[in-house]
From Swiss-Prot:
The protein's name: Probable prefoldin subunit 1
GO molecular function: protein folding chaperone; unfolded protein binding
Gene Ontology cellular component list: cytoplasm; prefoldin complex
Pfam families: Prefoldin_2
Subunit structure: Heterohexamer of two PFD-alpha type and four PFD-beta type subunits.
Keywords: Chaperone
GO biological process: protein folding
Gene it is expressed from: pfdn1
Coiled coil, from the record: none
Domain of life: Eukaryota
Length: 115
């Protein structure tokens, strides 16, 4: 019985470690998406302060291609929406993993109390 308890303890501890790593990765992805969204919003604000006749360029790989300001704004707004959706999805994932971590910690505490 003791061997099974040790094995269950180590498996639960490993699961807790894996879940914690997953949660940290998701938090990093949330931060990256939020930073990208902020950059897009700043760029949109800067573009709106320019006159409509100003030539604008879009980065394509290592080169820049002339692009109408309206299409740049549209692409940036779409990117902002995509980033917001990504953040919402990632927040849901983090809540789910957080609940799993809580459950796993509870199981780990029960195993420790058993001994």
């Amino acid at each position: 019985m003791e061997i099974l308890d040790k094995q269950a303890f180590f498996e639960t501890r490993e699961k807790l470690y894996t879940l914690s790593r997953s949660l940290n990765i998701i938090k990093q992805r949330i931060q990256i998406a939020e930073n990208d969204r902020k950059k897009c919003l700043i760029t949109i604000n800067e573009l709106e302060s320019l006159s409509s006749e100003t030539k604008t360029y879009k980065a394509v790989g290592k080169m820049f291609v002339i692009s109408p300001m309206t299409s740049l704004k549209t692409e940036l707004k779409q990117q902002v929406q995509k980033d917001e959706e990504d953040v919402k999805g990632l927040i849901n994932q983090s809540k789910y993993i957080d609940a799993q971590i809580t459950d796993t910690e509870r199981s780990l505490n029960e195993l420790v109390r058993k001994k």
